[in-house]
Structures are given as structure tokens and as C-alpha cells.
Design a protein with these regions (language model features):
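Secondary-structure transition/hinge residues
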Residues: 2-3, 31, 83, 121
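Basic/polar phosphate-binding segments, predominantly the helix-turn-helix DNA-binding elements
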Residues: 28, 34-70, 90-115
Length: 134
């Protein structure tokens, strides 16, 4: 609990901070951990609806969609550049279950993680900083 309180203090909003930026910075630094929408709402002092509306306006996706796609982006890098087992990559990217990771990866990219590893070029879920709608 103390560590979570310290994280909250570190990411606490100032008056001029964009809540979406605060959340994405937190996600980038902590994607491998359990992150909930409730926690992110608490982090930026907004309710779920408002936070998701701001994410949709700025990034074309909800907060949790962004988290999922960011985790999948990291997994693409690991699949391309390491020989780690797919279940280990899933775990390192914050997925509790390898089967869920496989399902989401295949759903979002149209190719399984093992197929992606064989031919990793030409697949992306991001266009600049925005999540592409697939």
C-alpha cells in the first residue's frame, strides 16, 4: 500500500497537467503490473466516463484499450528481438494468462504471436501516438 501511495504522489496532477498524459506516462512505466481503470481514475481525480472521453478525444481509444495496445506493442518488440517463450513475454507485458494474451494479440493483429515471430514486419496497432482502429 505504501508503494502505491508513493506512486500516486509521483504522478499526482498539477493544475496544468493533462490527465491523459499522466495516465499514459504511468502506463508506460508500469505496464507489466496490474493496472485498473479505477486506479487510473484515482490517479488523475476523474470519473471513468470523463477519463475515457478524454482518451477517446486525444488518442481514439479508451484508457483500457490504450493499456492493452501498449502491452501488445511491447510484446511485438519482444517477439521480434528476443527468444523468450511466448508465455514469458505475455507475463512480462502484464498479461496474467498466456491464453488471454494469445487471443488479444490475434484479435488485434490478425496473426498469432508465434506466426508474428516468424515474420514480424508490416504489423502495427499504432499510428504515431494514436491507437489505430482495426
Amino acid at each position: 500500500i505504501y508503494v502505491d501511495q508513493c506512486k500516486l504522489k509521483f504522478y499526482e496532477l498539477s493544475e496544468n497537467t493533462n490527465p491523459v498524459t499522466t495516465c499514459t506516462d504511468y502506463i508506460h512505466a508500469n505496464y507489466q503490473n496490474d493496472i485498473t481503470l479505477s486506479f487510473l481514475c484515482e490517479l488523475v481525480h476523474l470519473n471513468r466516463t470523463t477519463l475515457n472521453q478524454r482518451f477517446k478525444q486525444q488518442l481514439n481509444c479508451t484508457c483500457i484499450e490504450y493499456l492493452l495496445h501498449y502491452r501488445l506493442k511491447i510484446s511485438q518488440e519482444l517477439l521480434s528481438n528476443t527468444n523468450l517463450k511466448i508465455d514469458d513475454i505475455a507475463n512480462q507485458c502484464g498479461f496474467k494468462y498466456g491464453s488471454y494474451f494469445n487471443r488479444q494479440f490475434t484479435k488485434c493483429l490478425g496473426i498469432s504471436p508465434s506466426e508474428f515471430r516468424k515474420n514480424p514486419t508490416g504489423y502495427s496497432m499504432f499510428e504515431g501516438d494514436k491507437v489505430m482502429k482495426l
